[in-house]
Regions:
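Hydrophobic structural segments
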Residues: 4, 10-13, 17-191
Length: 191
């Protein structure tokens, strides 16, 4: 959150870091930009990466982000005015058997596709390609104040810079071991 003093100072200069940025980008342009940073070639062969549902030529209005594509996440994206729902996990791995809204509490992949089309929200994901991304591998350790070591629990075959499960070092605490309670508190603060 911006504090009031900095917002007022920017307003006096005629600037505002809170002003909405405008840009022209299509859904296909967004996908292309993300695939440049998170290459589809890094994804597991069984995974789906990139645009799953949507029209590449349509403009991006806003982008909503969620872990999973669910009918509720699609509805929230649409309500927020987003034309894209960017998720970690794909809406489906195998093609759905049917595309229809679900009346039950169980959410089927077909119901997600139905909701996306009905609400005109494109679905895009980068699952395992993001899991092994060098840039993404540094985000959580950075948030938790851990040192990234460029070592992985499961390195990606043929790569020294990519893999699953980054191994991190806990920073030195004036010669004292890191207390589990302090590390847990950092996790709670971040998440």
């Amino acid at each position: 959150k911006a504090d009031k003093a900095s917002t007022e100072a920017l307003s006096k200069r005629g600037e505002s870091h809170l002003a909405p940025r405008t840009f022209n980008m299509t859904i296909g342009g967004l996908e292309k930009a993300l695939l440049k940073e998170i290459p589809a070639e890094d994804a597991e062969k069984w995974d789906r990466t990139g645009l799953l549902v949507g029209e590449r030529s349509l403009p991006v209005t806003r982008v909503a982000v969620a872990l999973d594509a669910t009918p509720g996440a699609v509805a929230a994206a649409a309500e927020a005015g987003a034309s894209v729902l960017l998720t970690h996990h794909p809406a489906f791995l195998e093609a759905p058997d049917a595309f229809a809204p679900e009346a039950s509490a169980l959410e089927s992949p077909g119901a997600v596709v139905w909701a996306a089309i009905r609400n005109q929200v494109a679905l895009m994901d980068f699952h395992t390609a993001l899991d092994v991304s060098p840039a993404a591998a540094r985000v959580l350790p950075g948030m938790l104040g851990l040192k990234f070591t460029l070592r992985f629990a499961e390195p990606l075959e043929g790569s020294r810079r990519k893999g699953y499960g980054q191994i991190c070092e806990v920073p030195d605490n004036d010669g004292e071991p890191e207390a589990l309670a302090r590390l847990a508190a950092r996790c709670m603060a971040v998440f």
